[in-house]
Amino acid sequence: MVFDAAHDAGPIVLAVGGRHVVAVVCTHGHNDHVTVAPQLSEALDAPVLLHPADDVLWRMTHPDKDFRTVNDGDTLRVAGHELRAIHTPGHSPGSVCWHAPELNAVFSGDTLFEGGPGATGRSYSDFPTILTSISEKLGTLPGETVVYTGHGDSTTIGDEIVHYDEWVA
């Protein structure tokens, strides 16, 4: 599984080596997360996965390329571990985090970072919606769950959710 194929397919293909890639997963449709997804899909013979609510964003970068839809609760099996899609709108309408309970991890894209929620100043973003996604979806995960973010350092659910009231204020 490759998350958020953004800038240059070559180094990603080299890092994958000869391993089988189940999917090229886009946590959301902003261009900095999807730029080389079709190219990687072709090079790795793996489908691009994206939530359908981000179709409008996808089409801004890839008007003639299709993707396979992923919805809340969908699962993928990767290297013997199950990952479950959690639809977390707010940063974009189709933002999706991927929870791997056996690995005690969640891949949050731009929904949650060390220090708080993802930015909501971009088109199709909404601050109250991202707060709801974090509190009702990510906030229910165990506190020790490691959050691998779309940009920057990792954190944990517990380290972030304690600041929820500050974000709302």
Feature roles, as predicted:
Residues 64, 82, 87, 93-169:
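Metallo-beta-lactamase
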Residues 2, 45, 120:
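Short, flexible active-site loop motifs that bind/organize anionic cofactors or intermediates
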Residues 1-19, 97-109:
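Conserved beta-strand hairpin/beta-sheet module of binuclear metal-dependent hydrolase folds
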Residues 2-3, 22-29, 37, 48-52, ...:
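Active-site neighborhood of phospho(di)ester-bond hydrolases with catalytic His/Asp-centered motifs
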Residues 7-82, 162-166:
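Active-site HxH/HxHxD metal-binding segment of metal-dependent hydrolases
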Residues 5-8, 30, 123, 153:
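Short beta->alpha junction loops/turns
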